[in-house]
Regions:
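Glycine-rich acetyl-CoA-binding "A-motif" of GNAT/NAT acetyltransferases
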Residues: 1-3, 74
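Conserved acyl-donor/pantetheine-binding loop and adjacent beta-alpha core of acyl/acetyltransferases
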Residues: 6-32, 36, 40, 94
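A generic local structural motif
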Residues: 15-18, 51, 89
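C-terminal "cap" of GNAT-fold acetyltransferases
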Residues: 23-27, 62, 69-76, 80-82, ...
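Conserved acetyl-CoA-binding loop-helix of GNAT-fold acetyltransferases
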Residues: 32-35, 41-54, 77-81
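Conserved GNAT acetyl-CoA-binding A-motif
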Residues: 49, 56-68
Length: 108
């Protein structure tokens, strides 16, 4: 196993505080993108995200939305490099006192 990701088409309640770019109609929500440590730095996360984007376009989705831990510099840099816009922050008090950055990339 090189990597994994979880995606859904349903928006979790904690995302409702974010002022999203695209309408909340048909969007992809990315959760838990991970690449095995032995395979990091080889472009696998980018490949996974490009695959999700392609599937989103094929399925007429408005955008891809996601969050990542604010202190995860690699993920934050990856999403910015791939054209995602940081739109705000949310908190998961049961996970961390630090915020999670929310990103969106319109597909149309």
């Amino acid at each position: 196993l090189i990597g994994c990701v979880s995606i859904t088409f349903e928006m979790d309640d904690f995302y409702k505080t974010i002022d999203w770019i695209s309408p909340t109609k048909k969007n992809i929500y990315v959760h838990r993108l991970a690449v095995h440590p032995n395979n990091q730095g080889q472009g696998h996360a980018k490949t996974i995200m490009n695959f999700i984007e392609k599937k989103g376009i094929e399925n007429f989705c408005e955008s891809i939305r996601l969050d990542t831990f604010s202190m995860n510099n690699k993920n934050n840099a990856l999403y910015t490099k791939l054209g995602y816009q940081k739109l705000g922050q949310i908190y998961f008090r049961d996970q961390s006192e630090m915020p999670f950055n929310c990103y969106e990339k319109p597909l149309k």
